[in-house]
């Protein structure tokens, strides 16, 4: 009997260790950097892990204290809230499991799926924001399957989301690689794609949405 109790205890302990080390398989994301307390909103959004993280289920973002920005906030409020941040920078990237990653003002917040990322991109469209990234070598329109890389949609679809309505005028702008990219009258343009975030963290591609003062 004591051996059975020891075996069951060891089995439970193993289950806890397995649960914690394989959070992705259980719809949980591992803790990614500092300042990531709370949950992201929406049925398609996975909650932040840490200890006791859980799935989204419509839960609000709990930002804690990020440059004076405090949660909880909803996804539709994010584009209004981040305008008050000093860095004016929001990132949407992708993880290897095809879930997107939300980075607010340098603070890594959590995981988004394709629909959630699309909603977020749509929520900031129409503001005076510039879609930027760090690597000028990548031509966004030449990516054959952006869904697998960003979890959003095809390249044309995402460019459409980042573009203004057809009635708005458009211009061109040269990126650091010398290529011209579409720029809307509201300041939206795609320049390049940044690959990699931190070698000590999860590998991801990242798009930066920088708030540009007009």
UniProtKB/Swiss-Prot annotation:
Polar residues biased stretches: 181-198
Compartment(s) of residence: Secreted
Region of interest called Disordered, as start-end residue ranges on this chain: 157-198
Protein name (Swiss-Prot/TrEMBL): Uncharacterized shell protein 2
Organism: Pinctada maxima
Tissue: Prismatic layer of shell (at protein level).
This protein's record includes keyword Secreted: yes
Annotated GO CC locations: extracellular region
Keywords, comma-separated and alphabetical: Secreted, Signal
Position of the signal peptide: 1-23
């Amino acid at each position: 009997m004591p051996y059975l109790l020891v075996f069951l205890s060891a089995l439970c302990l193993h289950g806890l260790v397995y649960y914690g080390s394989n959070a992705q398989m259980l719809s949980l994301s591992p803790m990614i950097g500092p300042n990531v307390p709370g949950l992201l909103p929406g049925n398609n959004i996975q909650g932040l892990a840490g200890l006791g993280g859980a799935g989204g289920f419509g839960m609000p973002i709990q930002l804690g204290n990020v440059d004076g920005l405090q949660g909880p906030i909803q996804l539709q409020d994010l584009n209004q809230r981040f305008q008050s941040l000093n860095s004016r920078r929001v990132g949407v990237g992708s993880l290897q499991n095809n879930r997107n990653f939300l980075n607010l003002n340098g603070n890594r917040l959590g995981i988004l799926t394709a629909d959630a990322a699309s909603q977020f991109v749509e929520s900031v469209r129409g503001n005076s924001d510039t879609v930027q990234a760090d690597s000028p070598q990548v031509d966004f329109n030449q990516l054959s399957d952006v869904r697998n890389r960003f979890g959003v949609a095809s390249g044309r679809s995402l460019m459409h989301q980042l573009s203004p309505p057809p009635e708005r005028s458009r211009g061109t702008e040269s990126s650091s690689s010398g290529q011209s990219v579409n720029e809307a009258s509201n300041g939206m343009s795609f320049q390049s794609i940044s690959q990699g975030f931190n070698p000590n963290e999860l590998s991801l591609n990242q798009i930066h949405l920088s708030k540009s003062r007009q």
